[in-house]
């Protein structure tokens, strides 16, 4: 399941983040890749310990905590500190799979990568290529979103970033450990939550809405790894 979360930041806010990031010290992205990914990875990244990466990463996490779509879709338990990458001049990242568990360098904490997230930071019209391509049993799914919008998809997915042939692509990427580790279960809970919100807005029958809300929370109680 791929979920688009529009407007995490406004285009103007995203443009300000881009200006701050352009002045940063970028390193070869292969420095943070595993043996398999290193063969297909060609981009630049900010070091995870870079003060600017931490500062903007904290801003992203605060913004996500206020985003109802993200909270409902991800049911986050832990969020890996956001990282940042930059593609230009034909750079790309071939098909790969993210590590199942990632350790946070600043602590002994580990994050299970149930969900992967990419937050697009610059205007898609400002660069050619750079699509995120996620492959599953139904084929390939392409994402190249507006500045400030984010795509959320299962961390188990095979995915790649197409070559950027004009301009540059700046993005933040990170992983989410969910209270509910199974994608199918999260999808069902999201569908139920959306239905509950729509029925609430329509002032639906109170008893039926109460039953559906109870079923949602009982399933969450059954499946949550809290």
Swiss-Prot record:
EC primary class: oxidoreductase
UniProt cross-references to Pfam families, sorted A to Z = 2OG-FeII_Oxy_3, PKHD_C
Transmembrane as a keyword of this entry, yes or no, is no
Q: Where does 2-oxoglutarate bind?
A: 169
Q: Where is the Fe2OG dioxygenase domain?
A: 78-178
What is the E.C. number?
A: 1.14.11.-
Binding of Fe cation: at which residues?
A: 96, 98, 159
Keyword Iron assigned: yes
| GO terms for biological process, alphabetical | DNA damage response; intracellular iron ion homeostasis
Cofactor note as given:
Binds 1 Fe(2+) ion per subunit.
Molecular function as annotated in GO: 2-oxoglutarate-dependent dioxygenase activity; iron ion binding; L-ascorbic acid binding
Alphabetically sorted, this entry's keywords are: Dioxygenase, Iron, Metal-binding, Oxidoreductase, Vitamin C
> Which metal ions or organic cofactors does this protein require, according to UniProt?
Fe(2+); L-ascorbate
What start and end residues bound the annotated signal peptide?
Answer: none
- The protein here is known as PKHD-type hydroxylase Bcep18194_C7101
Q: Which organism is it from?
A: Burkholderia lata (strain ATCC 17760 / DSM 23089 / LMG 22485 / NCIMB 9086 / R18194 / 383)
